[in-house]
From Swiss-Prot:
It holds the Pfam family NAPRTase. GO terms for molecular function: nicotinate phosphoribosyltransferase activity. It comes from Bordetella petrii (strain ATCC BAA-461 / DSM 12804 / CCUG 43448). Transiently phosphorylated on a His residue during the reaction cycle. Phosphorylation strongly increases the affinity for substrates and increases the rate of nicotinate D-ribonucleotide production. Dephosphorylation regenerates the low-affinity form of the enzyme, leading to product release. This is Nicotinate phosphoribosyltransferase. Keywords: Ligase, Phosphoprotein, Pyridine nucleotide biosynthesis. The modification Phosphohistidine is found at residue 216. Signal peptide: none annotated. It catalyses: nicotinate + 5-phospho-alpha-D-ribose 1-diphosphate + ATP + H2O = nicotinate beta-D-ribonucleotide + ADP + phosphate + diphosphate.
């Protein structure tokens, strides 16, 4: 089986899940899968995908896994107790044929607390099933050579002594074995340049730092859970701060675009949060705007961290590191370019929350193609409320 541990997912799923347990235990949500890569035929593999998801739903956390989660400073004991009883409910996931030729349809609907852990392993399953059928003889040597070239861009440049990169590629990895090789190789060869991984299982197994804070779904759900739509981003950040009391302090900035984020990210949040994460739009413009915003709020940017994670490559990350050197702390999360770069085109697949408590939710990011919503009227209303230009 592809997924053999419920820890084989990204850390931010657990940090969000703990907030859901403590603040929104009754929330009901719906997620929908989408493949953005044209011309991909996944239908021949439907039965394989269903079998893998069935096996996923039989998994439980082991005692060793629960102890590891409990050792993380921000994970509370009642959450670990809850996870000791947890399994993914198979009745909440539906897998079938999509509307377009070759397309598959995957939806997840049910309690947020019980369905939040579906997304990452399901995407990893779709990826691995597809590639093990279409790339039966992967060019491992090509992949290893590409990885070495990337690492040496950093290792061979003394000016990049402070460069830190994390592996963020669970959902779009070529395979779990290749994923593990990437993490073990980076740990062995990059030393302090390797900040860690978003994958909790690999962090535990290789004794590296698990990394992650919040994802888009958290801020999207707060559109339905907060007091009113206009205040939903502030509400989400305040609930996060109430839960973590200053820990896990990287705010996600692109659910409503940078303009709306800066309007809401006032002096209080500037001081309270450690920094922000970029995930769409021009990263250089975004970084400069954020630094200016900190200065305008009388906060020294040198004490803050800018995290870049949008479709990053090593050359792009190095360029960003040079631009912001000495002006703030920077960190980089590289996903697909690490875990699925063996010389073929990776799949652009996502699984996004589309409803919470019966109402539509959406991300209106700085990259229009990333917007995913099944209700155009709601999307138009969201743009109006957050003073965003029409699509």
């Amino acid at each position: 089986m592809i997924i053999t541990s419920l820890l084989d997912t990204d850390l931010y799923k657990f940090s969000m899940m703990q907030v859901v347990l403590h603040h929104f235990p009754a929330a009901q949500v719906e997620y929908r899968y989408k493949c953005r890569t044209p011309g991909v035929n996944l239908r021949p593999y439907l039965d394989e995908i269903r079998a893998e998801v069935h096996a996923l739903c039989q998994l439980r956390f082991t005692e060793e896994e629960l102890q590891y989660l409990g050792s993380l400073r921000f994970i509370k004991s009642d959450f670990v107790d809850f996870l000791g009883l947890f399994h993914l409910p198979e009745r909440c996931i539906s897998i079938g044929e999509g509307e377009q030729p070759g397309e598959i349809a995957i939806t997840v609907a049910g309690p947020w607390l019980h369905t939040i852990l579906f997304e990452i392993p399901v995407l990893a399953i779709v990826n691995e099933v597809y590639f093990r059928n279409t790339r039966r003889h992967p060019d491992w040597d090509e992949g290893r050579q590409r990885l070495q070239s990337k690492m040496h861009l950093v290792l061979d440049d003394p000016a990049l002594a402070d460069f830190r990169v994390a592996e963020y590629g669970t959902r779009r990895r070529f395979s779990k074995l290749w994923h593990e090789e990437i993490v073990s190789t980076m740990k062995a060869q990059m030393g302090a340049h390797f900040a860690g991984t978003s994958n909790v299982l690999l962090a535990m197994r290789h004794n590296v730092l698990p990394l992650g804070t919040m994802g888009h779904e958290y801020l999207q759900a707060c559109q339905a859970l907060g007091p009113r739509l206009r205040d939903s981003q502030v509400f989400a950040l305040e609930v996060w701060a109430k839960e973590y009391r200053g820990d896990l302090g990287i705010a996600l900035s692109d659910v409503y675009g940078m303009d709306a984020f800066l309007r809401d990210f006032d002096m209080y949040f500037c001081k309270l949060f450690d920094g922000a994460r970029h995930d769409s739009g021009d990263p250089f413009v975004w970084g400069e705007r954020l630094l200016e915003h900190y200065r305008n709020n009388r906060v020294d940017p040198r004490a803050k961290t800018l995290v870049f994670s949008d479709s990053l490559t090593f050359p792009r990350a190095i360029e960003l590191a040079r631009q912001f050197a000495g002006r703030c702390k920077v960190s980089f999360g590289i996903g697909t370019n690490l875990t699925n770069d063996l010389g073929h085109e990776p799949l652009q697949i996502v699984m996004k929350m589309v409803r919470c408590n019966g109402q539509p939710v959406a991300k209106v990011s700085d990259a229009p193609e990333k917007t995913m919503c099944d209700d155009p009227a709601y999307l138009a209303y969201l743009r109006q409320v957050f003073q965003l230009p029409p699509a």
